[in-house]
């Protein structure tokens, strides 16, 4: 079976990972960093905003079940793609809304989806999502992997991540994988 990979960032990678992990067709997802100028950045370094890396997720998915275009369409509904360098209380370039295509085909698809979403006026403001070429994806430290599932009672998880997961389940029920535990959010 052939798999495709996408690298996207929409604020805190814990949030994006938690929602997209529930998406039918996703085989694996890894939080990490990309788009900056420092090799092998750490979470602490990225949080300073000086590395210019974004918190991103690397999503490996089955294109026979989930197309890259549909993944991007869903991605643009699970975070606020209209506010530059911010998601809620999380502020800084590391929280920018970004699509990092790995090929010309992905870049063209990303441009098409952004134009489609703008034209549909789904959001009240213009999109601030950028398209940046994927140079290197740096996996995040192990403590960031599947953070929401491992810390569901943490204050940030309850206040920020759980509502996003519940909203995704409600508004995109036809895209939620069948074997997700209802206790996850």
Swiss-Prot record:
It catalyses: L-methionyl-[protein] + [thioredoxin]-disulfide + H2O = L-methionyl-(S)-S-oxide-[protein] + [thioredoxin]-dithiol; [thioredoxin]-disulfide + L-methionine + H2O = L-methionine (S)-S-oxide + [thioredoxin]-dithiol. It is an enzyme of class 1 (oxidoreductase). Keywords: Oxidoreductase. Gene3D superfamilies: Peptide methionine sulphoxide reductase MsrA. Pfam families: PMSR. It comes from the Bacteria. The active site is at 12. GO terms for biological process: protein modification process. Transmembrane segments: none annotated. Its EC number is 1.8.4.11. InterPro entries: Met_Sox_Rdtase_MsrA_dom (IPR002569), Met_Sox_Rdtase_MsrA_sf (IPR036509). One of its GO terms (molecular function) is L-methionine:thioredoxin-disulfide S-oxidoreductase activity. PANTHER family: PEPTIDE METHIONINE SULFOXIDE REDUCTASE, PEPTIDE METHIONINE SULFOXIDE REDUCTASE MSRA 2. Has an important function as a repair enzyme for proteins that have been inactivated by oxidation. Catalyzes the reversible oxidation-reduction of methionine sulfoxide in proteins to methionine. Belongs to the MsrA Met sulfoxide reductase family. This is Peptide methionine sulfoxide reductase MsrA. It comes from Granulibacter bethesdensis (strain ATCC BAA-1260 / CGDNIH1).
């Amino acid at each position: 079976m052939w798999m495709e990979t996408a690298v996207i960032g929409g604020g805190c990678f814990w949030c994006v990972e938690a929602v997209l992990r529930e998406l039918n067709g996703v085989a694996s997802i890894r939080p990490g960093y990309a788009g900056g100028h420092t090799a092998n950045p750490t979470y602490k370094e990225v949080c300073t905003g000086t590395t210019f890396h974004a918190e991103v997720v690397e999503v490996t998915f089955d294109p026979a079940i989930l197309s890259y275009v549909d993944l991007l369409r869903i991605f643009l509904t699970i975070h606020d793609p209209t506010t530059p360098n911010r998601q809620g209380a999380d502020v800084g370039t590391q929280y920018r809304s970004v699509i990092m295509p790995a090929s010309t085909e992905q870049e063209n698809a990303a441009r098409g989806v952004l134009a489609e979403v703008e034209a549909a006026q789904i959001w009240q403001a213009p999109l601030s999502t950028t398209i940046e070429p994927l140079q290197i994806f740096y996996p995040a430290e192990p403590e960031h992997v599947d953070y929401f599932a491992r810390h569901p009672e943490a204050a940030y998880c309850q206040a920020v991540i759980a509502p996003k997961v519940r909203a995704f389940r409600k508004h995109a029920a036809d895209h939620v994988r069948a074997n997700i535990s209802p206790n996850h959010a």
